[in-house]
């Protein structure tokens, strides 16, 4: 399962209990039992937004969280900054799928990437960034900073840019 702003902490410790005796448990440290995800967009990417969009993050099939990106004519788009918490459902083989769909420079764009090896206590910060190529075309990329993996997925969008690019 996945929820916004709902971290789950826990710990376990093996011990034996004997009848008529006091058992000392000692110190138990609770840790995050989920993987945390936050979504960001850099200013260059937000400047390319021309309509509403959504970033969907899914770790357990059928239980995605939707991070809204809201277009505001004449002002900077706003977006969901909450941290999502995801159950780690498949041990070291747990995979996260990130899908952006929205209006970029007047066209509906969709980009999907996956990150494998998701673990409890990981915090993945996903940042969508504008990318200007040497040819002058603008595009965007997804950069995922986390404790496990840093990945970049590129998608070229035809565009022109003035200035020092």
What is each residue range found by the language model?
Residues 1, 19, 49-124:
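Tryptophan-paired
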Residues 1-36, 42:
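Short, low-hydrophobicity acidic/polar segments
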Residues 40-50:
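Structural motif
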Residues 116-165:
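Hydrophilic extracytoplasmic domains
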């Amino acid at each position: 399962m996945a929820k916004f702003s709902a971290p789950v902490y826990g710990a376990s410790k093996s011990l034996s209990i004997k009848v008529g005796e006091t058992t000392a448990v000692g110190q138990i440290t609770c840790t995050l039992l989920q993987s945390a995800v936050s979504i960001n967009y850099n200013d260059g990417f937000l400047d390319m937004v021309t309509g509403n969009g959504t970033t969907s993050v899914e770790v357990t099939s059928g239980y995605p969280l939707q991070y809204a990106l809201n277009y505001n004519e004449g002002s900077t788009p706003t977006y969901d900054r909450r941290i999502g918490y995801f159950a780690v459902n498949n041990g070291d083989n747990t995979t996260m799928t990130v899908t952006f769909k929205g209006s970029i420079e007047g066209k509906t764009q969709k980009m999907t990437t996956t990150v494998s090896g998701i673990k409890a206590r990981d915090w993945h910060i996903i940042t969508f960034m504008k990318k200007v190529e040497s040819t002058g075309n603008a595009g965007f990329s997804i950069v995922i900073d986390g404790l496990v993996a840093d990945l970049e997925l590129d998608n070229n969008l035809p565009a022109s840019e003035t200035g020092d690019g």
